[in-house]
């Protein structure tokens, strides 16, 4: 088996200021007026170059077609292509899954995507690209179902039209600490039980974030918010939008920008429902962030600490730490010129383990 080694180039520069590697020009993107539903405001992002992304396979597409297989570490026998060696069986691990991309297309994975099944439901911890016809690839994941370590299914799938909401994504992407993720899942489930009282008994009967989000009453509440943005996607196609900036209770918390309108479309339902879920579990009164603030948030991509990880010829992932925010950029190296596939930015200040929550998630 031809293993590709992930070469990590780590730069820790304190006191210096620089732009995130491969970040788009700050003047490229323009934020449009928001569409607001309750305490959730969505600011469309237009402008910037359009790249051909049709060749990128999403996790949903890959699992649905059977071209992508996800399994517990140590359960790969029979899944690897004939003639390929099988790595030693190290047994199932909470923070490790193994993925094989049998397709002819590169696979795009986004932080926050949830895979259900196996011994526990997991959330993917970081963006990455998996090359076509890959051998087994270790995935960095975090459990979002404390308390279960018994196989519910031999196969992994994804939650249909679901992605972990921003408040759950933050500890996985930034803290990278399992206990922090479990703590946030517990808090989120409690808040969701209050937001959807009929679902409270079922939510409290299980520790599963995925099951809670799939509860009919929770689906109804999340869907009622998300439905207000159904028509927005049609308008965004017309103007070639590539991303969105998100505000809850008047606080800007997140931005997602893609390489193409087509890619934004593919993730639209997942993203909108994740923001809607966060608006329900962070319900409070507040003003509305203005358009100028949303534009400023999107433009501030500089920081004083940067971590770069790269798989040569496949992708580069950059994390930039700024004053009150984190920027994550996934760059494709599989074609020339290289290009930014996905940019995610979150408002963030301090450590969740020290009791300081992400900006905009404070209660």
Where are these regions (language model features)?
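Bacterial N-terminal signal peptides
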Residues: 8-17
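Positively charged n-region of N-terminal signal peptides that target proteins for export
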Residues: 1-7
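Intrinsically disordered, low-complexity segments enriched in small/polar residues
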Residues: 20-107, 112-363
């Amino acid at each position: 088996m031809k293993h590709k080694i992930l070469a990590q180039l780590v730069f820790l520069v304190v006191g210096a200021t620089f732009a995130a590697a491969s970040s788009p020009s700050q003047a490229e993107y323009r934020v449009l007026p928001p569409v607001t539903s309750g305490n959730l405001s969505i600011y469309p992002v237009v402008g910037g170059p359009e790249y051909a992304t049709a060749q990128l396979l999403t996790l949903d597409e890959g699992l649905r077609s059977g071209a992508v297989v996800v399994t517990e570490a140590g359960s790969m026998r029979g899944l690897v292509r004939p003639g390929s060696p099988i790595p030693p069986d190290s047994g199932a691990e909470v923070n490790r899954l193994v993925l094989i991309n049998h397709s002819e297309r590169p696979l795009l994975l986004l932080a926050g995507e949830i895979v259900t099944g196996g011994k526990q439901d997991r959330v993917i911890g970081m963006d990455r690209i998996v090359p076509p016809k890959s051998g087994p690839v270790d995935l960095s994941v975090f459990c979002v179902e404390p308390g279960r370590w018994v196989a519910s299914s031999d196969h992994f799938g994804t939650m249909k039209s679901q992605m972990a909401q921003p408040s759950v994504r933050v500890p996985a992407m930034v803290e990278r600490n399992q206990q922090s993720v479990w703590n946030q899942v517990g808090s989120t489930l409690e808040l969701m039980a209050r937001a959807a009282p009929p679902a409270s008994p079922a939510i409290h009967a299980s520790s599963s974030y995925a099951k809670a989000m799939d509860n009919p009453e929770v689906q109804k509440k999340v869907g009622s918010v998300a439905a207000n943005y159904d028509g927005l996607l049609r308008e965004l196609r017309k103007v070639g939008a590539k991303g969105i900036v998100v505000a809850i209770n008047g606080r800007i918390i997140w931005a997602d920008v893609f390489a193409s309108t087509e890619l934004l479309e593919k993730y639209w339902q997942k993203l909108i429902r994740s923001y809607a879920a966060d608006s329900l579990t962070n319900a409070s009164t507040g003003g509305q962030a203005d358009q100028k603030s949303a534009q400023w948030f999107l433009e501030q991509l500089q920081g004083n600490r940067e971590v770069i990880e790269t798989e040569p010829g496949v992708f580069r992932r950059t994390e930039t730490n700024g004053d009150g925010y984190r920027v994550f950029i996934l760059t494709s190296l599989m074609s020339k010129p290289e290009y930014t596939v996905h940019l995610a930015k979150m408002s963030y200040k301090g450590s969740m383990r020290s009791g300081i929550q992400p900006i905009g998630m404070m209660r």
